[in-house]
Amino acid sequence: MPQIRNDWTIEEVQNLLQMPLNDLVFEAQTVHRQHFNPNEVQVSTLLSIKTGACPEDCKYCPQSAHYHTGLDRERLMAVESVLAEAQAAKEKGASRFCMGAAWRNPKDRDMPYVIEMIKGVKALGLESCMTLGMLSNEQAKMLQQAGLDYYNHNLDTSPEFYGDIITTRTYQDRLNTLNNVRDAGMKVCAGGIVGMGESVTDRASLLVQLANLPKHPESVPINMLVKVEGTPFAKLEDLDNFEFVRTVAVARILMPASHVRLSAGREDMNDEMQALCFLAGANSIFYGEKLLTTANPEADADLRLFERLGIKPEQRDGYDDEVHTAVIEDAIKEQQNPVRYYDAS
């Protein structure tokens, strides 16, 4: 089994990205099989606990207060409401509950509510994860002490291209948050976005940043830009699908023991594209972020694709994604009142 590395160079990664596609996907699948069951995919859902009105100016994001995208702004959900959602999921057999807030960073006044959410979710016996923006060292410790398992904070793009995307926080701010999360003892979820007009070198540089962290992120979301009217990136040209697949494959090769997640943009990928990404080493999806607010035919598409590909939800010690998936299926069939699910990656 190849040794896990933290010393990749941009030149090495560029060379991987430019390999013949068949060779690249073969290498990625070979690496993948050394660390994971190739026919299992991790499934996760996310609940938005606070939506819209974010003060950051990320040019891709419909939640930014800088742009007029028609997104409804919502205040922080009450702790009782969040725990009611968690309890309902628990009663139906859910194993994991993830919460996301559109903040630059949580304020001191927010922390007691967030901590109570974590404690309540953990008291139910559920695995917990959050994405709240930047964290100080002290805030990270508070979340860890409350029992948080995972924290998501993306690097978005390369250090060189970053200034063309965001001006309200620095690249180092993002790295500092990841360091604070890791130092506090939580697991890290960190990835990026492709299709924002970046070069191949920028994609290589992003992957190098992630792979050369002192410890690889446990989860690496690879997002395809979702172009939203009202944002500065609404009119960008589409990224070639094969370039996205190459990014997934190289992420798998560089971070062989991490979950590589198909995240934002997956709803716009056809079945063949998703299957090729799974072949290239993707083994995690946000499964259900839109399922409870869309019509049944769209909701059932994921279930049908898994069946056609012979893919099963991942089995993990202490958690059963088969049960987690069954919760989502049950909710679809019952046609419950809409519950907002939010791709906070």
UniProtKB/Swiss-Prot annotation:
The gene is bioB. [4Fe-4S] cluster binds at C54, C58, C61. Pfam families: BATS (PF06968), Radical_SAM (PF04055). [2Fe-2S] cluster binds at C98, C129, C189, R261. Keywords: 2Fe-2S, 4Fe-4S, Biotin biosynthesis, Iron, Iron-sulfur, Metal-binding, S-adenosyl-L-methionine, Transferase. Its cofactor is [4Fe-4S] cluster; [2Fe-2S] cluster. It comes from the Bacteria. It catalyses: (4R,5S)-dethiobiotin + (sulfur carrier)-SH + 2 reduced [2Fe-2S]-[ferredoxin] + 2 S-adenosyl-L-methionine = (sulfur carrier)-H + biotin + 2 5'-deoxyadenosine + 2 L-methionine + 2 oxidized [2Fe-2S]-[ferredoxin]. Homodimer. Residues 39-266 form the Radical SAM core domain. Its EC number is 2.8.1.6. Catalyzes the conversion of dethiobiotin (DTB) to biotin by the insertion of a sulfur atom into dethiobiotin via a radical-based mechanism. This is Biotin synthase. SMART domains: BATS (SM00876), Elp3 (SM00729). Belongs to the radical SAM superfamily. Biotin synthase family. CDD domains: Radical_SAM. Signal peptide: none annotated. GO terms for biological process: biotin biosynthetic process. One of its GO terms (molecular function) is biotin synthase activity. Binds 1 [4Fe-4S] cluster. The cluster is coordinated with 3 cysteines and an exchangeable S-adenosyl-L-methionine. Binds 1 [2Fe-2S] cluster. The cluster is coordinated with 3 cysteines and 1 arginine. Pathway: Cofactor biosynthesis; biotin biosynthesis; biotin from 7,8-diaminononanoate: step 2/2. PANTHER family: BIOTIN SYNTHASE (PTHR22976), BIOTIN SYNTHASE, MITOCHONDRIAL (PTHR22976:SF2).
